[in-house]
Curated annotation (Swiss-Prot):
Coiled coil: none annotated. This is Adenylosuccinate synthetase. The keyword Ligase applies. PROSITE patterns: ADENYLOSUCCIN_SYN_1, ADENYLOSUCCIN_SYN_2. Keywords: Cytoplasm, GTP-binding, Ligase, Magnesium, Metal-binding, Nucleotide-binding, Purine biosynthesis. Plays an important role in the de novo pathway of purine nucleotide biosynthesis. Catalyzes the first committed step in the biosynthesis of AMP from IMP. SMART domains: Adenylsucc_synt.
Length: 430
């Protein structure tokens, strides 16, 4: 048995898709366990760039099972669109498996997401408006519709009718906007269910059987630890648990079967959406990092906020996710910056603190304590080993590993999978 979890250590967009794709080569099953099509993965495979939002990155390996776990929320319309996108590019999806226990995103979830963000105005969360939050709300309220329900027309119709009574009251009375008729949704979404029916099964059985047979299973997290609903910068978070612990709930695999957790990070920090960001750069260096790193959201197209590497954030991620291995991406983006900074702690009300605060008010008042390091000007995009890197780049990586307390296992010097380099295998026995 060999199981590896890939999690983002920051606010998402760390390059998890690329690392998952890279690690998928040596895995036999690849599974997502939380989130929905609010995630965005950009993957280069055989020289072609693909952008996925819902389907796991391992889909490009037709001999490997690719799982959408029970902890995900699935927009059937978006899924059909993504399947068509892959089919048009001659990518087989016969290896896809979808949990019959995953919850379904319906049009009223999308509408509620949109109007609630508008209502909040300046206090908005910065949601992708994909209906993720409202779908998870229904799940917690025990009125959600699952994939298994979607496949049974009578059950789907009964639950949809019940839900529309409540949702329409909410839309019309509170938000003063038009609701939905059952005929607006029933036939269209039931048909979507029929189109994906061949992929649907009990994915917990698929995953546990694979582990019991000694096969390598890779769990792909979406977003990042700082967007986790429990451990992140609440309320500026997603509605699920991207932390490694989310695997057990969102995939139906017990915690004793998880061996290694790979924390993926950029060599700097980015964030999409609102909320405090202690190391944010609003100067020319920030603009340079954004443009060189092409820091625009895969899902939203929004420019990402950028900042210096924050070891306080990544230490927090290490602790709450049990991270055993660090994968550091986008090192090449920092090339040409004369002096680099790493946040080693925060200064709050005159005191130096080394742990991430729970209070957003406190976080907003924190000032980063920086350690400066000399940069490098050499082209590092062809580096294959640590010794290929210039001395200053190597020292930067070593310092990041020291400050976060996570051994460096993978480093990346460009967007292509060939620019991803392994220092030690994450599939090791111990």
């Amino acid at each position: 048995m060999s199981s590896v979890v890939v999690v983002g250590t920051q606010w998402g967009d760390e390059g998890k898709g690329k690392i998952t794709d890279f690690l998928s080569e040596n895995a036999e099953v690849i599974a997502r366990y939380q989130g929905g099509n609010n995630a965005g993965h950009t993957i280069k495979f055989d020289g072609v760039t693909y952008k996925l939002h819902l389907i796991p990155s391992g889909i490009f390996y037709k001999e490997k099972a690719c799982v959408i776990g029970n902890g995900m929320v699935v927009d059937p319309k978006a899924l059909i669109t993504e399947l068509a996108y892959l089919h048009e590019r001659n990518v087989s999806t016969d290896n896809l498996r979808i949990s019959n226990r995953a919850h379904v995103i319906l049009p009223y979830h999308l509408k509620l997401d949109e109007v609630e963000e508008e209502r909040k105005g300046a206090n908005k969360i910065g949601t992708t408006k994909k209906g993720i939050g409202p779908a998870y709300m229904d799940k917690a309220a025990r009125i959600g519709i699952r994939i298994a329900d979607l496949l049974d027309r009578d059950v789907f119709a009964e639950k949809l009718e019940r839900n529309l009574e409540e949702k329409n009251r909410l839309l019309e009375k509170m938000y003063e906007t038009e609701g939905f008729k059952i005929e607006d949704i029933l036939d269209e979404y039931y048909e979507y269910g029929q189109q994906i029916k061949k992929y649907v099964c009990d994915t917990s059985v698929v995953l546990n059987d694979a582990l019991d047979e000694g096969r390598r299973v890779l769990f792909e997290g979406a977003q990042g630890v700082m967007l986790d609903i429990d451990q992140g910068t609440y309320p500026f978070v997603t509605s699920s648990n991207p932390v490694a612990g989310g695997v057990t709930i969102g995939s139906g695999v017990g915690p004793t079967k998880i061996q290694h957790v790979v924390g993926v990070s950029k060599a700097y920090t980015t964030r999409v959406g609102d909320g405090p960001f202690p190391t944010e750069l609003k100067d020319e260096i920030g603009d340079q990092i954004r443009e060189v790193g092409r820091e625009y959201g895969t899902t939203t197209g929004r420019p990402r906020r950028v900042g210096w590497f924050d070891s306080v954030v990544v230490r927090h991620a290490r602790r709450v996710s049990g991270i055993t291995d660090l994968s550091l991406n986008s090192i090449d983006v920092l090339t040409g910056i004369e002096t680099l900074k790493i946040c080693v702690a925060y200064r709050y009300k005159g005191e130096v603190i080394e742990e991430f605060p729970a209070s957003l008010k406190a976080l907003a008042e924190c000032e980063p304590v920086y350690e400066e390091m000399p940069g490098w000007t050499e082209d590092i995009t062809g580096a294959k080993t640590l010794s290929d890197l210039p001395e200053n780049a190597r020292h930067y990586l070593e310092r990041v590993s020291q400050l976060t307390g996570i051994p460096l296992s993978i480093f990346s010097v460009g967007p292509d999978r060939s620019q991803t380099n392994v220092i030690r295998s994450v599939y090791r026995a111990n």
